[in-house]
Structure formats: structure tokens, C-alpha cells
């Protein structure tokens, strides 16, 4: 046998075997399933929970602790991000349907105002006393800012906090049985657990699109996650809910984590005190420009026009007397 002639053939044969995977065994890593007892429910029962709870909850005011995380892409780096976390911010939150929100954060320790944001269906205003800035803008973002928190809008908070009713005139809801990842209460390792998912399809004109996906835990039949989509099918809000409590027939979570993957920020709200359905006046959602503050109109940067407190952003930017 000519050793030098057969060696390349052997090497080639081994190479082909390696490429075809004959010498390797691949397997999927399957996480164990939770052994928690699971409850059964039909789609009508889950949809009724969403609609009934939404109808009962018309407004609330709350003491809240904020935890804000910002993820910003490093300059010149496509896969590297700078992450900043702002913790220990307490404050207040006022919410009134259909789309009124007031969000106040306090300076840790001092408890003076760190930020104050008011918004409705037409636009928002944001006061930042520590920087003497007053920011106004519309709710629509035509050109995202490279500063993630400049993309924060009240509807992102409002829609995540309150599970909207499923409108039978414009929406269709279907049930899917799926699985979710949960933590083992003993060792905190990831486990798979069966869940229910209500998929909401919305119709506008001749077009239907995926609007929301609401996940229910089968341990307690309460929602623990909601995905909200845009018209392009992107997830724009990923909200998770923990520790629901019953407030005289209104179910509301103790902690809400709101992730906005497109804009690159997330906000966790932990509620320490909640009061539901007490009257909240219109002026509680009005935020006027303080004298001497520099006004920043985000819509002049983005090219669209805002309406804030019944005024356009241009009108709101005029000096107050």
C-alpha cells in the first residue's frame, strides 16, 4: 500500500464524516416542568376576567417606587451596549381613563421633585426641576432619540398598567395553550410551566393585525405578562405582573415591569399604596411650564406637532405670565 497516496483519502473521509455529524450526537436541553397544580379555564372565562376588571377600574392614585434601566448602544459598537440603572426613586402616580396620567418622581433622601410628567391622548409635558428643563411633545415618535428616556411617552406606561377591554366590534380573541418559564420557589432555577395565552387580533378597515398577547398563569388564572405589538408585528411593550391583590373586586399587581425593547429602556413600578376609583380632577393632570425653565420641544426635533394640556407644543412653549 502506498501510504502517502492513501493518507489524503483518509483525511478527506474523516472530514466528510465530521461535516455530516456522524461522530457527534446533538440534543436539546429541556428544562424540567413545574409540578405545581394547574387550573383549567376556557377562553370565555379569561376574556371575561379581562373585561370585567377593566370595566371596574376607572382611576387610581398610588405611592410607587421606580426602578429605571436604560440600554444605550456604544458608539461604533454594533453589539455592545451601555446599561445604566436608576434605583431608589419613590414618587406618585395618578391614572384616569381614558388616557390621563400624571407621574412624579422624588429625589432620594431629599424628596424634592426629580421629574413630573403629565400626559393625555394628544401629548405630554415633562418638568425636570434639577435641570430647569420643561419638555413637551406628542405621543407619536416619528424619529427616535438616541437618548432612550427622551422616547418615554405616557401611553407606554398607561397601556402596560391597565389591561384594556377586548372590544368585540374591532377585536377578535383566541386562546392558545403554551408554556412559560417560571422560577422554582425552592432553588430559583428555571422551570417550564403550561400557561394560557389570549391572542388579540385587531381589525382596522380591511386589515387585521396582531395587537396583544396576554399570558395567564395556570396556577392562579391571573395575567402575568402582556406583549403589545405595532403594525409591523414588532413587540413594543413587554410587561410582566407580579403579586396580584384583590382590592374589593379590582385585581391589581403589586409590581409591574415594563420593557420597551425598541426604545431601549425599562421601568419597574412597585406600588406601596393604592386607592381606586376616587374622583381625580382635570387640573390634577395639567402641568404648566415653570418660569425660567428652558423649554425643549421634541416635535420640533422630530417634525410633528404636539398638543399639550389643550395647546399645541408651540403654544405651550410661549412664556407664561
List each model region and its residues.
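Gly/Pro-enriched, hydrophobic low-complexity segments
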Residues: 23-25, 175-292, 296-300
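Generic short beta-strand segments
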Residues: 63-72, 106, 199-203, 228-229
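Long, hydrophobic/aromatic-enriched structural stretches that serve as scaffold segments
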Residues: 70-108, 112-116
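An acidic-aromatic
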Residues: 24, 96-159, 293
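Edge/loop elements at the starts and ends of beta-strands within beta-rich repeat scaffolds
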Residues: 51-60, 84-87, 94-99, 117, ...
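Flexible, processing/modification-adjacent segments and terminal tails
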Residues: 44, 128-212
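N-terminal leader/targeting segments and the immediate start of mature chains
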Residues: 22-88, 151, 302-321
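Sec-dependent bacterial lipoprotein signal peptides
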Residues: 1-22
Amino acid at each position: 500500500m502506498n501510504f502517502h497516496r492513501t493518507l489524503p483519502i483518509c483525511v478527506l473521509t474523516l472530514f466528510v464524516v465530521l461535516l455530516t455529524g456522524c461522530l457527534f450526537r446533538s440534543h436539546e436541553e429541556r428544562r424540567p416542568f413545574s409540578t405545581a397544580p394547574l387550573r383549567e379555564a376556557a377562553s370565555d372565562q379569561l376574556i371575561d376576567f379581562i373585561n370585567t376588571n377593566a370595566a371596574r377600574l376607572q382611576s387610581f392614585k398610588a405611592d410607587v417606587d421606580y426602578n429605571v434601566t436604560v440600554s444605550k448602544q456604544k458608539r461604533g459598537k454594533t453589539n455592545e451596549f451601555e446599561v445604566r440603572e436608576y434605583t431608589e426613586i419613590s414618587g406618585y402616580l395618578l391614572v384616569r381613563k381614558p388616557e390621563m396620567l400624571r407621574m412624579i418622581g422624588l429625589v432620594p433622601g431629599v424628596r424634592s421633585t426629580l421629574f413630573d410628567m403629565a400626559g393625555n391622548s394628544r401629548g405630554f409635558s415633562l418638568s425636570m426641576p434639577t435641570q430647569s428643563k420643561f419638555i413637551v411633545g406628542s405621543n407619536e415618535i416619528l424619529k427616535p432619540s438616541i437618548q432612550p428616556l427622551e422616547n418615554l411617552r405616557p401611553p407606554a406606561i398607561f397601556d402596560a398598567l391597565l389591561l384594556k377591554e377586548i372590544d368585540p366590534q374591532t377585536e377578535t380573541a383566541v386562546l392558545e395553550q403554551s408554556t412559560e418559564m417560571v422560577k422554582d420557589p425552592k432553588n430559583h432555577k428555571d422551570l417550564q410551566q403550561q400557561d394560557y395565552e389570549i391572542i388579540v387580533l385587531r381589525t382596522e378597515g380591511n386589515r387585521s393585525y396582531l395587537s396583544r398577547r396576554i399570558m395567564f398563569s395556570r396556577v392562579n388564572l391571573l395575567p402575568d405578562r402582556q406583549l403589545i405589538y405595532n403594525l409591523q408585528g414588532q413587540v413594543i411593550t413587554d410587561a410582566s405582573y407580579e403579586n396580584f391583590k384583590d382590592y374589593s373586586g379590582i385585581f391589581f399587581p403589586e409590581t409591574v415591569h415594563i420593557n420597551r425593547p425598541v426604545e431601549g429602556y425599562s421601568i419597574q413600578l412597585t406600588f406601596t399604596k393604592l386607592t381606586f376609583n376616587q374622583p381625580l380632577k382635570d387640573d390634577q393632570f395639567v402641568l404648566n411650564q415653570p418660569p425660567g425653565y428652558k423649554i425643549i420641544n421634541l416635535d420640533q426635533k422630530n417634525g410633528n406637532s404636539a398638543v399639550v394640556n389643550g395647546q399645541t407644543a408651540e403654544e405651550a412653549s410661549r412664556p407664561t405670565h
